[in-house]
């Protein structure tokens, strides 16, 4: 999807299910999916064949599926691949929205493919889709302070100062996803980066 596409797209917000994870850094993808759902005025329903919460919408006439896997982050690949197969969405039209340790807090970046950077949700998706050639909306959460284990850091809530900024960052990430869907990767990167 370098230029705008007309086929169906699958937008996947990554996170962990359960109230104990709701406000953690690792769940920022779920927050973006929720904002996109609000914007199209719809609610998620369980898609039993995939094991994901799903809503179907139209953006400028294009079918857009917005999903939140109901599995834990490390097992996200199975529901993503099931949705892509069920709705005939090629991996190149899958957009995964996720937290990114390697970006400063609040940065939003778009890219296609590349490594997983230790992100087990991405690793699971790459394995299930049998390719890394899918789109990513990366939301910077920064690095853990001191010697804190990154695995612990991503499962902690945002710090008090960060919490005030999260709603704005989530809106910016949702804007980036919509722009990507409208104009394609290259044009969206040129506008955002």
From Swiss-Prot:
One GO BP annotation of this record: rescue of stalled ribosome
InterPro entries per the UniProt record, alphabetical: Pept_tRNA_hydro, Pept_tRNA_hydro_CS, Pept_tRNA_hydro_sf
Marked site (Discriminates between blocked and unblocked aminoacyl-tRNA) residue numbers: 16
EC number: 3.1.1.29
Catalytic activity as recorded in UniProt: an N-acyl-L-alpha-aminoacyl-tRNA + H2O = an N-acyl-L-amino acid + a tRNA + H(+)
Site keyed Stabilizes the basic form of H active site to accept a proton: positions: 99
Major site of localization recorded for this protein: cytoplasm
Signal peptide coordinates: none
Cellular localization per UniProt: Cytoplasm
Active site: 26
Pfam families: Pept_tRNA_hydro
Protein family: Belongs to the PTH family.
Subunit field text: Monomer.
Protein name per the record: Peptidyl-tRNA hydrolase
Source species of the chain: Nocardia farcinica (strain IFM 10152)
Gene name per UniProt: pth
């Amino acid at each position: 999807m370098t230029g705008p596409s007309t086929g169906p797209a699958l937008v996947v917000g990554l996170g962990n299910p359960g109230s104990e994870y709701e406000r953690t850094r690792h769940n920022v993808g779920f927050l973006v999916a929720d904002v996109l759902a609000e914007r199209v005025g719809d609610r998620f329903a369980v898609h039993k064949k995939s094991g994901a919460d799903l809503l179907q919408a139209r953006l400028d006439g294009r079918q857009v599926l917005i999903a939140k896997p109901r599995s834990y982050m490390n097992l996200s690949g199975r529901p993503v691949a099931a949705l892509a197969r069920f709705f005939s969405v090629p991996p190149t039209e899958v957009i995964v929205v996720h937290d990114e340790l390697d970006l400063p807090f609040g940065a939003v970046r778009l890219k296609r493919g590349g490594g997983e950077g230790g992100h087990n949700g991405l690793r699971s998706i790459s394995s299930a889709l049998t390719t890394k050639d899918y789109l990513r909306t990366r939301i910077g959460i920064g690095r853990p302070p001191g010697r804190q284990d990154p695995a612990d850091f991503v499962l902690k809530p945002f710090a008090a100062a960060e919490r005030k900024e999260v709603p704005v960052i989530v809106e910016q990430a949702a804007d980036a996803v919509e722009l990507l869907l409208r104009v394609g990767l290259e044009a969206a990167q040129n506008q955002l980066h």
